[in-house]
Amino acid sequence: MNELSKAHCSIWADLRGTSFSQGWLDAGGIRTRFLHAGNPGKPVLLLLHGVGGHAEAYARNLRAHAEHFDVWAIDMIGHGWSDKPHHNLEIPHYVEHVLKFLDTIGAKTAHISGESLGGWVASRIAADHPERVLRLVLNTAGGSQADPNVMARLKALSLQAASDPSWEFIKARVEWLMA
């Protein structure tokens, strides 16, 4: 990669050549941001990001999946450009939000792929609402039982990295996640 291309790298460069839309929908009273690609006549594939993530986590996947699915990547409640409530979020809040989103786009069923927190949410949806899930794909899914001390440490590191995205704090969070 030459210096000019390094200077102009962007997450949006991954979407170059991909026919997609970006927008917001009201999912049960929650303004929800999405990236959408693919054919509405095909089965829905919903992509759920991890803690502190956003829809762009799947920017490199949209084009390939759009050939076979009606693909939606969302900013889950409390993340990205979607609404942020004034209360702590628990898994049932995320599950309700995702189900309302599916209802809003008219999807009775969907293939759901989740990464980290998104995997935890996806697996909870599959367990509680199996009639809504065609296929479940879990990528480094969070557990169904979280240790409060581990979750507190994850929250502290994530907030620190978000409020001061210096190399030191980002590195500390990633190293902790990979330990």
Indicate where each model-derived feature is located.
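An N-terminal hydrophobic leader/cap segment in hydrolases
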Residues: 1-24
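Active-site loop/oxyanion-hole signature of alpha/beta-hydrolase fold enzymes
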Residues: 18, 25-37, 42, 60-63, ...
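Short beta-strand element of the alpha/beta-hydrolase
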Residues: 42-50
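The serine-hydrolase catalytic nucleophile loop
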Residues: 50-63
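Alpha/beta-hydrolase
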Residues: 177-179
